[in-house]
Design a protein with these regions (language model features):
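Conserved beta-strand-loop surface patch within small alpha/beta domains used
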Residues: 1-78, 87-143
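Short, well-ordered beta-to-alpha junction loops that form the rim of enzyme active sites
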Residues: 84
Length: 143
């Protein structure tokens, strides 16, 4: 199972952004570095959901281009994307499965259906969704 790490403040930013955009799905991109231990998310991009829908999202192409330019300028690698599920579990929906095609990307899904948010991460390998191991950490407790 692939490990994908993220600082706690980045996770908090994703949760807050997703809650601010309820009842719509919130979405964005992830950038960072790849190491022998796995992936390290160093920057989260918050993009507009062009569909403004509760059950799917479309990333704004202009926002995507700006994010990619910023990644290049900061020598970060695109690692994948993230989106929220306002009222469904943190697992790929039928729509997520239909649209996912990049085996190099991580797909983080944040569920807001319960009292406490649930984050899972996946990647697609030969059309099969495989779970990753997302690890949220603070500077004091890196693992």
């Amino acid at each position: 199972m692939a490990i994908i790490r993220m600082r706690d403040h980045l996770y908090d930013e994703i949760v807050n952004y997703a809650k601010e955009h309820l009842p719509e799905e919130a979405c964005g991109l992830l950038a960072g570095v790849e190491t022998e231990e796995g992936r390290e998310i160093q920057k989260v991009y918050f993009l507009e959901n062009k569909d403004h829908a509760e059950d799917h999202f479309t990333l704004d192409p202009r926002d995507q281009m700006n994010a990619i330019k910023d990644m290049r300028a900061n020598e970060l690698k695109p690692l994948g994307n993230w989106h929220s599920h306002p009222s469904s579990p943190s697992r790929p929906s039928v729509e997520d499965i239909r649209l996912a095609f990049d085996s190099k990307a991580s797909y983080l899904i944040l569920s807001l259906m319960a009292e406490y948010p649930v984050l899972n991460s996946f990647h697609v390998e030969s059309g099969v969704w495989e779970k990753e191991d997302p690890r949220i950490y603070s500077v004091e407790y890196f693992f």
